[in-house]
Structure formats: C-alpha cells, structure tokens
Amino acid sequence: MRLAVGALLVCAVLGLCLAVPDKTVRWCAVSEHEATKCQSFRDHMKSVIPSDGPSVACVKKASYLDCIRAIAANEADAVTLDAGLVYDAYLAPNNLKPVVAEFYGSKEDPQTFYYAVAVVKKDSGFQMNQLRGKKSCHTGLGRSAGWNIPIGLLYCDLPEPRKPLEKAVANFFSGSCAPCADGTDFPQLCQLCPGCGCSTLNQYFGYSGAFKCLKDGAGDVAFVKHSTIFENLANKADRDQYELLCLDNTRKPVDEYKDCHLAQVPSHTVVARSMGGKEDLIWELLNQAQEHFGKDKSKEFQLFSSPHGKDLLFKDSAHGFLKVPPRMDAKMYLGYEYVTAIRNLREGTCPEAPTDECKPVKWCALSHHERLKCDEWSVNSVGKIECVSAETTEDCIAKIMNGEADAMSLDGGFVYIAGKCGLVPVLAENYNKSDNCEDTPEAGYFAIAVVKKSASDLTWDNLKGKKSCHTAVGRTAGWNIPMGLLYNKINHCRFDEFFSEGCAPGSKKDSSLCKLCMGSGLNLCEPNNKEGYYGYTGAFRCLVEKGDVAFVKHQTVPQNTGGKNPDPWAKNLNEKDYELLCLDGTRKPVEEYANCHLARAPNHAVVTRKDKEACVHKILRQQQHLFGSNVTDCSGNFCLFRSETKDLLFRDDTVCLAKLHDRNTYEKYLGEEYVKAVGNLRKCSTSSLLEACTFRRP
C-alpha cells in the first residue's frame, strides 16, 4: 500500500504517468463582442471535434498589445493581428511569430499579401527619387499602403525637423490629400480635398478615393494597393495610361506590381510564441474549424462573419487559412521593405538610399575558413567590406533578405532560391581568360558525373545501388542537374533509396545520403566547409576515398590531379584514372567533357537585395581591380580569388566578376531551361527557405 501511494505521489509531482498532452488553444479576445464570438467558436468546435482533438478556451484582454504580452507570458496562445501589430509582436521581449495566415480570393489562387504601390500617370515623367514638390494622394492618415509605407520609405528625404511628421510631409509635397489629417494644423495635407474628411463622404478617401484624386488630376501620385487600379479601371487601354514607380527609380506597367512595389503587406495573421507556441495545434484547430465553419459551410456559426460587430477574431472578408511555413519568422514574413518603413517611422532611423554614398557591403561568410578570408578582405578593403557569418547558405540568403547581410556569391541552384526570395544577381563569376573579362558574358560550365576508370562496368544506366558523392543538396552540378535527370527516369524523390549510400551535405542526418560523409559530430553532412566532403573538391575526395560516382563541374578533376592539389589525399592522383559517364550509356576520358556531360550549368553569381544592387556592383568592381586576378603574388598580398583551402567566398578559378548586361533577374540569368529543370525538382525539395519564400512570392 505504501509503495502504491508513493508511486502515485511521484506521478502527481512529475506529471509523467499517463500524461495527456494539453490540446487547448487559449484564444485572446479584445472586446465583449469578440469574447462572445470566441465562446460561440469554443462551443461549436466542441460539437464537431472528437474529445481527444483540439479545443478552444477564451482569454479576454483590453487591447491587442495586452494580448501580445499575454501570449509572450504563456497566459494565452493565439490572436489574429494586422501587419503593424505583427511587427510589435515580433519585437523583443515579445518574440512572437506568424503561424497561420488568413487568405482572400479563391482556394485555387489564395491571396495572403497585397502590394503597396505608387501609381502615376504615364506621361508625368518623374521617378521615385523626384517626389519632392509633387502633389500626393493618400488613402488616409496612418493607413498602411496610403501613408505608413510610402512615408516610412521617404522618411530620410523629408525636410528636418521630421517631428511632427505631418508637418514634414506637408513641407515635402507641394500639396496633398491625406484624409483624417488635421486640416487646421496642417492645411497643406488637405489642400487637394478640403476638410480632409475621414469617411467616404470625402470623394478622395480610401483606396478608390486616392486613385480618383490622381485620375482627376488633383494629385501627381497615388499611394494605394496593387488591386486598386484594376478595381477602378476594367479596360486595359485605360490602365495603360498609368504606371508604377519602383524603388530603384524606374517605372513599370501596373500589372508588374510583383516586381515594382513599395512593400509587400501581409494579410491578417495568427501569431504564437516562437518557442513552445503550439503552432501545430493552432493549425490543426483552425484547419478543422474552416472545414466545419468556413465560407458557406454552416449557418449555425461562421468563422468569417461578425453579426455583432466587424472583423471579430478574424477578418469578415477572409476566405480561409493557410499554414505559415515553419522557417518563416516575423521579419521574413513582413519583408524587408515593410520592416524598414515601419522602423523608420517609429524609430526615426534612415535606410540607405540608392543615391547615398555607398555604405560598406556586408558579405556573408560560411564556416570558419570563409570568415578568416572575409576578415582579411575587410582589413584590406579599408572598411568597404564588412563580414557577417552564417552556418548555411540558406541562412546567409535569409540574412541578406532581412538586411543583416548584403551579398554573397552563389551556385546556380542557390541563385534560384535567392531569386525566389526576392534577391537579384548583380555580377557573375567568369572562369575564362579574355582581354575584356568584365564585359565578356560568362559561358557557364559543364556538370559531369565522374567515376573511377577501374569500375569499368559502371554507366549512367546502372547507378542504382551505387555510392554517390554530391557537392551539396540544392547545388547545381552536385544535385539539381543529376537529381533532376534521375527524377525524370524514376519518377519519385526517394534518392536515398536509389543510391545505397552517399554524401550529399544538407541531407537529413539519418539519411543514407549522409552515411559516407566525413564530418565529425554535429558537422557531419553539414552544407559548409566543416564537412570535408562538401563542395566540388569535397565531392571528388568522397569519390577517391569512398564513393562510386561524384557529381561535380568539369574543372574539378584536373584541378585536383597531377599534383595541382598538394593535400595528402590528392597529391598523387592521376587524371587518367578517372572517366566521365555520358547520358547515352557510354564513358569518355575526363578531357572530353564537351561531348560527355549532364548539362551546361550557369556560373556562380553574386546576389543582393534590389536596394543594394548599385552599391554592391560599384564596390565589387573596385575591389576586384585592387585584389583580383591581376595580383600575381598571393603569398604576401590579399587575393580575392585564391583560398587557403578551396573555393572560399568565390571559386578559386574565377578570373573576374563580369557584368550581367540585361540578365539581371534570376530567371534571365539562369535561363529558361535551367529554371524549368529546377522548378520540376521543387517537388523533391527539402529547402525550408524555398518553401517560405514561395509562400511570399507564389
């Protein structure tokens, strides 16, 4: 008896015996009407969800900020917020993250974001950096697309003092219509719409009103959302009389808003704690809720309806929910432009404008060796280059997206991911010596499959069950091209079953494609130089020491044989001991790569954000003139294209960084065939970053 009581006490204290996981989502409501709807939500979910399923509890607070604090303190679990409040929720000490997004439109084409744009008449002739002295049309004071975003981005161009903000804006434009502004204190903000009425009684109020202000000729520019012009002008010929102002001081047609906008603004979003936030449970609850009580599902209770108010718990105009990818934090979800605009307004900080003197370029380095080289570059550049570290290439891309870093050079596979994340190529590594290297369009390189000559029975057609060596998951020659070709043959993504073993850095640690890797401890199979079989040289070493086939570039074998690589594993290797697999089932000597390869691949390219494009281009061209291939003695001087190990920051065989001319988007740079091939392989992608970026830019 005493033992039994003791056991029960242990169970009670530790909570370990037959523990039932807490499947309750505590929803935060900010008014009596919201609390009433929350209780109805709770009761109706009980009637349709099994007893072991998710349930709702309601927590009432006085404001959204109180809800944010309650969730951070684990007194509540979820609340739906607009974009501005998502920014507040993300800031320390709250540290909340978006977990579920409302969508609008159809299930087939769900809209989770809108674009804030600056619309002008086609014949007006000015650019974004020439708005001073123009007449402006705004949806309303304090509204996202019509005020916060454009004024936030223009903040540093406003005349000082910038407080009060309304006065600075009034002095920047020659006249405005900013509904809801104080016309007595700031008459210039009401010059185009006398009275500045804060309702539809003011003909220039709201999205359609701001566009009408432009259309009528009262203003020169209207700050609205991307759909406004389509909602007000059904005829394409009429829409063609208008253009969008882009942040890089160019213009684009109104239907190119995805590539020419002030910011991408997310829809209303459910937020939760970043750690222990029940995000999967919240999604399970809301997914089941929309199945039972979504649009046109039930007359008893409707998630997206507010009989006793407007937009209670969720927006009445929402059509459903989408799960936010787990890789996406609030900064990525809101986007660099939006975060910059809001931070400028709240903190009075200024972004780097394209017309400013270029600030240092923050280069993203992977691994200890890359950081050492980057630091040496930084010292030699006399402050033109600064260094930022990240564990993986995808982490670097994310840092560039959110402004923590500015640039890095990427393999074509990662140029694709970076492009999907909104980054742009700015210069290409060129590996061919010529009299005018910087102006010579790069020709690309060949992706090849290398085997040992002694394995004479091995061909492209009988690779199943063999041991494979890859540069890294997601890279061009080592993964995208060979796996894309294999996918077309086997019609599934289980490459870890196709090969018996392999080393494909970036694979899941328990995958057979990590079994051949040589990294120790946590560095095993990591997609950086801490894994000895990472990259071109690493994949070839994997073949030399353990594998049957290596997927690399055509220069890899000659660069690591004949004594060119002095490392102990490579110094005695002979190029003649290796052969290439051809797609027709034959084999050829290594030097015949032009007639025996898997595909031609795009050269590595430097990527950056659109707002840094001009500065990165300018500074890198200066840097290569100082430290490029014209430096002959690298023993006593810093050389940009030489490495203590292999291919640090840039490929070691880079001759120069070449201009892209008109190939300044990832699609144009990579080419239609490569983009299509990588797109087909996306269904096999394990890239959490690609998933997140595709959510933002479908």
Swiss-Prot record:
Positions of hydrogencarbonate 2 binding: 471, 475, 477-478
Modified residues (Phosphoserine): 389, 685
Signal peptide (residue range): 1-19
Residue ranges annotated for the Transferrin-like domain, each copy included: 25-347, 361-683
Residues glycosylated per entry: 51, 432, 491, 630
Record: residues binding Fe(3+) 2: 411, 445, 536, 604
GO molecular function terms listed in the Swiss-Prot or TrEMBL record: enzyme binding; ferric iron binding; ferrous iron binding; iron chaperone activity; transferrin receptor binding; transmembrane transporter binding
Gene Ontology cellular component annotations, sorted alphabetically: apical plasma membrane; basal part of cell; basal plasma membrane; blood microparticle; cell surface; clathrin-coated endocytic vesicle membrane; clathrin-coated pit; cytoplasmic vesicle
Residue sites binding Fe(3+) 1 per the record: 82, 114, 207, 268
Keywords: Disease variant, Disulfide bond, Glycoprotein, Ion transport, Iron, Iron transport, Metal-binding, Methylation, Phosphoprotein, Repeat, Secreted, Signal, Transport
Record carries keyword Ribosomal protein: no
BP terms from Gene Ontology: antibacterial humoral response; cellular response to iron ion; intracellular iron ion homeostasis; iron ion transport; multicellular organismal-level iron ion homeostasis; osteoclast differentiation; positive regulation of proteasomal ubiquitin-dependent protein catabolic process; positive regulation of receptor-mediated endocytosis
Main function: Transferrins are iron binding transport proteins which can bind two Fe(3+) ions in association with the binding of an anion, usually bicarbonate. It is responsible for the transport of iron from sites of absorption and heme degradation to those of storage and utilization. Serum transferrin may also have a further role in stimulating cell proliferation. (Microbial infection) Serves as an iron source for Neisseria species, which capture the protein and extract its iron for their own use.
Subunit structure: Monomer. Part of a complex composed of SLC40A1/ferroportin, TF/transferrin and HEPH/hephaestin that transfers iron from cells to transferrin. (Microbial infection) Binds to Neisseria transferrin-binding protein A (tbpA or tbp1). Forms a large complex with TbpA and TbpB.
UniProt protein name: Serotransferrin
